[in-house]
């Protein structure tokens, strides 16, 4: 089991239930967003965002559509650039690199690839290679990107597919797998790169309830058995409450409110948070 996150400042962990939790003070965050702004034309999707995540912490990100949740993950994975600010992963800047005489330069592609290798991401769509079997999908990146020997990559891929409950599907192609099975292959593929941080972007949104449960069970197991830091964008409120160490409610490109699951779900302090959770309950 992952040990409880004990290196947050105690002031953030001793608040009564009816007090909104401030941003925790984390001495050595594994992920850090510092004044990050991202714009699409005149629309600001991330607005001076600040967020630190502790090693091994599981953070659920909730909020209405268009609030910046998925963009947060996409800029962390460098699928999108940022307009302002700084992002760090495991003590290294993802957006800048050291230059001469202490100068900070915009990170080049080589530097970005090195830092980004510490991150794995699973998307809403499975994005599997349709012409490759489940096993080949998991083997491909370690061999081509990390230079892992094929035999070693195959052994690791087999272990991961067993772990996600697909030990009997090695040679099946994506078209022969259910949506839940494809998503579990995608999780195994991300884990094959041995990331320190895992990102999940609405990974159950395209699945029916039964298949959704299959995927959430795998993520639950990852959280309990592996020392991975996880950031999950989700509308699965029950799962987020059970799974997360911290819940961040996004609104208009900022963290509008954050706290423990009990604080956010039982006694949110901000009216916009209360309205969102009420709408979710009514929809369900």
What are these regions (language model features)?
Residues 2-4, 8-9, 251, 258, ...:
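C-terminal boundary and immediately downstream tail of ABC-type ATPase nucleotide-binding domains
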């Amino acid at each position: 089991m992952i040990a409880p996150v004990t290196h947050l400042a105690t002031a953030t962990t001793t608040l009564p239930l009816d007090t909104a939790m401030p941003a925790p003070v984390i001495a050595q965050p594994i992920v850090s967003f510092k004044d990050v702004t991202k714009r699409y034309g005149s629309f600001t999707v991330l607005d001076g965002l600040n967020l630190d995540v502790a090693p091994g912490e599981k953070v659920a990100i909730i909020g209405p559509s268009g609030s910046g949740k998925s963009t947060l993950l996409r800029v962390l994975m460098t699928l999108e650039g940022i307009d302002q600010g700084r992002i760090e992963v495991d003590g290294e800047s993802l957006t800048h690199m050291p230059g001469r005489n202490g100068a900070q330069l915009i990170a080049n592609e080589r530097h970005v690839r090195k830092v980004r290798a510490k991150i794995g991401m699973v998307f809403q769509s499975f994005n599997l290679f349709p012409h490759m079997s489940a096993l080949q999908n998991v083997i491909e990146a370690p061999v081509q990107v990390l230079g892992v020997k094929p035999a070693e990559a195959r052994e690791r891929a087999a272990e991961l597919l067993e772990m996600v409950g697909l030990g009997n599907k090695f040679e099946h192609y994506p078209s022969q797998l259910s949506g839940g099975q494809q998503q579990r292959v995608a999780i195994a593929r991300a884990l094959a790169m041995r990331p320190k941080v895992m990102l999940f972007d609405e990974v159950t949104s395209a699945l029916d309830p039964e298949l959704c449960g299959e995927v959430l069970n795998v993520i639950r197991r990852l959280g309990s058995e592996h020392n991975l830091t996880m950031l999950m964008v989700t509308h699965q409120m029950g799962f987020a409450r059970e799974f997360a160490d911290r819940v961040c409610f996004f609104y208009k490109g900022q963290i509008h409110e954050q706290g423990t699951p009990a604080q956010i779900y039982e006694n949110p302090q901000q009216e916009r948070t209360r309205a969102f959770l009420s709408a979710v309950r009514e929809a369900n």
